[in-house]
């Protein structure tokens, strides 16, 4: 296969890895943000922790995979991206570290104040990635000030522009809704009722922020140009809207798993909508279009991409099957018996 074909395949796979990460770790992050609002008692807070408990660390594998693929398949894009977005990515790393610590440390001491401290850490360390990921991807869609040498000529505050902030709030609302639906699946009783109501309240928020983000995308980016050049891509926003519409429909029908699947479809299609709108661009330069790093000029050698593709065709299905088995194993709603000494 030629370099252009291989680079295109890996661009799609790279997008898919990010989409899968957003779907799987998105509900974990959303649960953490919802913790102080839905966890009214110690038992309810433990239910929220344990709704994410068996999954959260395995879900982060997809983030590592996305970063690893960026490094191996698109080394030039990796170098520029991690240099330009160094500050938000470092903040993201620290947030994920503290999130892991909050899971493990919370129940190590029998003290209400100790648990309250780590509940606060847990909330912040889940809120931050939601916002940071949205801000980072919105700025990638819009373009960042990098020159032909890959040197970033901006600042962290420069990333907090109107479009970046809209992206952060949009991601936050999606993950919160996604997490609320997961809590409907994993709980019973009063907590489930409040989670269901919360998902219903968040749905119109997601819709409004989606419309705002789409309007700002028209004025701030060139994403829609790809949809004029490649009309078949219109299936992505159509499927995204179908997924979003399916959330309240399935919740009202008492089918939370299908509602969560609809939310997952929405997340996947929104991710592909934005990233495929950049194609073949990966790091769009707002200073000089010639300095833009694309999937073609930033890719590894054809031999490297072929070897990686062979490995991916073997390993990715294995990981997917394992995670499917794990989700199936822990698909039952939580009960008080699940909150034993070994639970969170």
Whereabouts are the PLM-identified features?
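Juxtamembrane membrane-water interface segments of multi-pass membrane proteins
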Residues: 31-54, 72-75, 104-115, 179-198, ...
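Long, contiguous internal "core" modules enriched in hydrophobic/ aromatic residues
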Residues: 105-259, 273
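Short, membrane-exposed interhelical loops at transmembrane-helix boundaries
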Residues: 285-307
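Hydrophobic alpha-helical transmembrane segments
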Residues: 159-174, 301-319
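N-terminal signal-anchor module of multipass membrane proteins
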Residues: 1-58, 64-67
């Amino acid at each position: 296969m030629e370099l252009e074909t291989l680079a295109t395949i890996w661009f799609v796979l790279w997008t898919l890895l990010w989409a899968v990460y957003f779907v799987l770790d998105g509900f974990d992050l959303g649960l953490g943000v919802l913790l102080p609002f839905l966890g009214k008692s110690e038992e309810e807070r433990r239910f929220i922790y344990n709704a994410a408990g068996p999954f959260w660390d395995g879900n982060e594998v997809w983030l590592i995979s996305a970063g690893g693929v960026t490094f191996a398949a698109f080394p030039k894009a990796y170098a520029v991206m991690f240099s330009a977005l160094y500050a938000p990515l470092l903040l993201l790393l620290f947030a994920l570290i503290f999130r892991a610590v909050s899971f493990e440390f919370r129940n190590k001491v029998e003290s209400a104040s100790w648990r309250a401290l780590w509940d606060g850490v847990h909330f912040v360390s889940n809120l931050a990635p939601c916002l940071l990921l949205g801000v980072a991807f919105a700025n990638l869609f819009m373009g960042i000030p990098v020159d032909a040498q890959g040197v970033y000529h901006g600042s962290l505050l420069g990333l907090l522009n109107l479009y970046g902030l809209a992206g952060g709030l949009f991601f936050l609302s999606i993950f919160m809704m996604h997490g609320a639906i997961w809590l409907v699946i994993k709980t019973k009783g009063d907590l489930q009722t409040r989670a269901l109501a919360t998902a219903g309240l968040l749905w119109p928020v997601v819709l409004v922020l989606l419309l705002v983000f789409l309007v700002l995308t028209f004025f701030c980016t060139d994403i829609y140009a790809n949809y004029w050049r490649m009309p078949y891509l219109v299936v992505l926003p159509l499927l995204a809207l179908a997924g979003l519409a399916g959330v309240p429909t399935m919740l009202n029908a008492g089918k939370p798993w299908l509602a969560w699947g609809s939310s997952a479809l929405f997340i996947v299609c929104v991710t592909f909508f934005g990233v495929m709108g950049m194609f073949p661009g990966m790091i769009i330069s707002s200073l000089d279009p010639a300095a833009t790093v694309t999937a073609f000029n930033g890719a590894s050698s054809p031999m490297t991409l072929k070897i990686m593709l062979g490995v991916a065709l073997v390993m990715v299905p294995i990981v997917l099957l394992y995670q499917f088995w794990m989700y199936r194993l822990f698909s039952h709603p939580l009960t008080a018996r699940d909150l034993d000494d070994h639970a969170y």
